[in-house]
C-alpha cells in the first residue's frame, strides 16, 4: 500500500498547531522527529515528568495521507488554514508500506566483530570462517528493538566485549547491559564467557526481543531483563551502556554505581564533540582507559576505582 507523505519543519513550540492542522485535513498518522538527529546538536527526550511535554527545539513532522490525495490542493488548504504557520518548506513524496522485517532480513548479512564474535541473522547459515574456531555466534532477530550490529555504536561495544572475552575478563562473571535493545550485547557477552547477564531497557518491545533472542541462542536461563525501575540493585564486574550521551550524563551516578570496584564500564551512543562532557561526569568514579571512534560515534571505556 502506498501513501502520500507530507513533511514540514517547525519550531518545537509550534508543533501542536501544525499537527492539529494536518489532522484536520485527514492525516492518517503524524510522526515527530528531531530536526538535529545524527548531529552534535541531537538531544534525546526520555521519560518526561508528569504534566510535561518535552520536545526538540526544531521538529520535523511527517504526516501520511491517502496516496490519491491532491498534493497541490492539500498545500493550498494548509496555507490558508491558520495564520502564522509557515508551509513554505513543505515536502511531498509517495512512500510504500513495506514488510520492514522482511526488508531488513534480506539486507542483513553475517558480521564479524573482533576475533571471535559473529552476529548472524537467525535464518542464515553460520559463516565458514566461524566454523573452524572457538567462535561466539549470536543468532539475532531484533524485531522492533534497536541493536542488529549494523550501527557503529553497537559495533564499538561488540569489539570491546570481544577483547574482554579474549583477555579472560568475562569468564565466569556477570554482565549488565543497560539499554539492551535486542539483547545483542548481553548475548555476545554470554557467548564470550560470561556466566550470567542482566538486560535493562525502558521499552517493553526491547525486553520481548531480548527474551526471544536468548531462547534462540540457548541462553534463556542465563539472561534476565527488566524495566529500569524494576532492575535489581547490585554491582557487576562488567557493565555496558549503549544509549545517548545526554542519558549517560543524566544516569552517571546510577551507572557508575552498578560497576564493582575494579570492574569495567563501556559507554557508547556518544557523538563526536559530546565525549568531553561524558568523560567529565564519569571521572569521579573511573580511571579511563581509552576512547574509540567510528563514523563520528565514540565509545569510552574505563575501570571503576576501588
Swiss-Prot record:
Gene Ontology molecular-function annotations: protein-lysine N-methyltransferase activity
Record's GO cellular component terms: cytosol
Subcellular location: Cytoplasm
CDD domains noted in UniProt: AdoMet_MTases
Enzyme category, top tier: transferase
Main location: cytoplasm
Domain of life: Bacteria
Reaction(s) catalysed by this chain's protein: L-lysyl-[protein] + 3 S-adenosyl-L-methionine = N(6),N(6),N(6)-trimethyl-L-lysyl-[protein] + 3 S-adenosyl-L-homocysteine + 3 H(+)
InterPro entries for the chain: Ribosomal_L11_MeTrfase_PrmA, Ribosomal_PrmA_MeTrfase, SAM-dependent_MTases_sf
EC number: 2.1.1.-
Keyword S-adenosyl-L-methionine: yes
Binding site for S-adenosyl-L-methionine: 154, 179, 201, 242
Protein's GO biological process: methylation
Family statement: Belongs to the methyltransferase superfamily. PrmA family.
Function: Methylates ribosomal protein L11.
Name of this chain's protein: Ribosomal protein L11 methyltransferase
Annotated gene: prmA
Amino acid at each position: 500500500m502506498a501513501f502520500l507523505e507530507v513533511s514540514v519543519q517547525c519550531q518545537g513550540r509550534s508543533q501542536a498547531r501544525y499537527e492539529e492542522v494536518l489532522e484536520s485535513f485527514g492525516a492518517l498518522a503524524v510522526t515527530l522527529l528531531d530536526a538535529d538527529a545524527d548531529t552534535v546538536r541531537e538531544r534525546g527526550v526520555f521519560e518526561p515528568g508528569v504534566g510535561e511535554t518535552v520536545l526538540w527545539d526544531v521538529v520535523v513532522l511527517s504526516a501520511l495521507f491517502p496516496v490519491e490525495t491532491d498534493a497541490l490542493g492539500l498545500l493550498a488548504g494548509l496555507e490558508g488554514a491558520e495564520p502564522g504557520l509557515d508551509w513554505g518548506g513543505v515536502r511531498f513524496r509517495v512512500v510504500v508500506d513495506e514488510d520492514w522485517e522482511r526488508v531488513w532480513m534480506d539486507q542483513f548479512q553475517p558480521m564479524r566483530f573482533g576475533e571471535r564474535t559473529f552476529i548472524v541473522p537467525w535464518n542464515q547459515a553460520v559463516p565458514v570462517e566461524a566454523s573452524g574456531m572457538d567462535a561466539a555466534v549470536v543468532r539475532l532477530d531484533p524485531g522492533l528493538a534497536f541493536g542488529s550490529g549494523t550501527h557503529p555504536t553497537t559495533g564499538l561495544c561488540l569489539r570491546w566485549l570481544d577483547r574482554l572475552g579474549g583477555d579472560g575478563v568475562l569468564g565466569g562473571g556477570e554482565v549488565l547491559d543497560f539499554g539492551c535493545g535486542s539483547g545483542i550485547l548481553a548475548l555476545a557477552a554470554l557467548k564470550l564467557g560470561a556466566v550470567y547477564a542482566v538486560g535493562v531497557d525502558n521499552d517493553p518491545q526491547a525486553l520481548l526481543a531480548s527474551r526471544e533472542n536468548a531462547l534462540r541462542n540457548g541462553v534463556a536461563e542465563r539472561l534476565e531483563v527488566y524495566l529500569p525501575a524494576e532492575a535489581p540493585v547490585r554491582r557487576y564486574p562488567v557493565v555496558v551502556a549503549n544509549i545517548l550521551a545526554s542519558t549517560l550524563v543524566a544516569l552517571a551516578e546510577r551507572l557508575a554505581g552498578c560497576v564493582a570496584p575494579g570492574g569495567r564500564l563501556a559507554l557508547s551512543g556518544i557523538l563526536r564533540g559530546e565525549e568531553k562532557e561524558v568523560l567529565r561526569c564519569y571521572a569521579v568514579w573511573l580511571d579511563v582507559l581509552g576512547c574509540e571512534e567510528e563514523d563520528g560515534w565514540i565509545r569510552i571505556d574505563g575501570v571503576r576505582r576501588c
